[in-house]
Swiss-Prot record:
Residue numbers bearing the Pyrrolidone carboxylic acid modification: Q25
Tissue specificity statement from the Swiss-Prot or TrEMBL entry: Olfactory bulbs, hypothalamus and telencephalon, midbrain and posterior brain areas.
The protein's role, per its UniProt record: Stimulates the secretion of gonadotropins.
Species, as recorded: Carassius auratus (Goldfish)
Residue numbers bearing the Glycine amide modification: G34
The family this protein is said to belong to: Belongs to the GnRH family.
Annotated protein name in UniProt: Progonadoliberin IIB
Length: 86
């Protein structure tokens, strides 16, 4: 009986120490607990050309894609491969 009590005490102490030395969650830069993010001031000079085209109504990603998704994926992969070889 004494051995069982000592075993529980040792296990409890080990569990307590392991919790104390375990690494806790790291909050990355700009993130706060609860999933809230730091809001940066918007700089209009950082607007990309794609966004400017979208504001003009010429978004390439808004063009409806064909029904054959596999064909689109393969064509994109081939295009990337071709561009890498250039």
């Amino acid at each position: 009986m004494v051995h069982i009590c000592r075993l529980f005490v040792v296990m409890g102490m080990l569990m307590f120490l392991s919790v104390q030395f375990a690494s806790s969650q790291h909050w990355s830069h700009g993130w706060y607990p609860g999933g809230k993010r730091e809001i940066d001031v918007y700089d209009p000079s950082e607007v990309s050309e794609e966004i400017k085209l979208c504001n003009a109504g010429k978004c390439s990603f808004l063009i409806p894609q064909g029904r054959n998704i596999l064909k689109t994926i393969l064509l994109d992969a081939l295009t990337r491969d071709f561009q890498k070889r250039k």
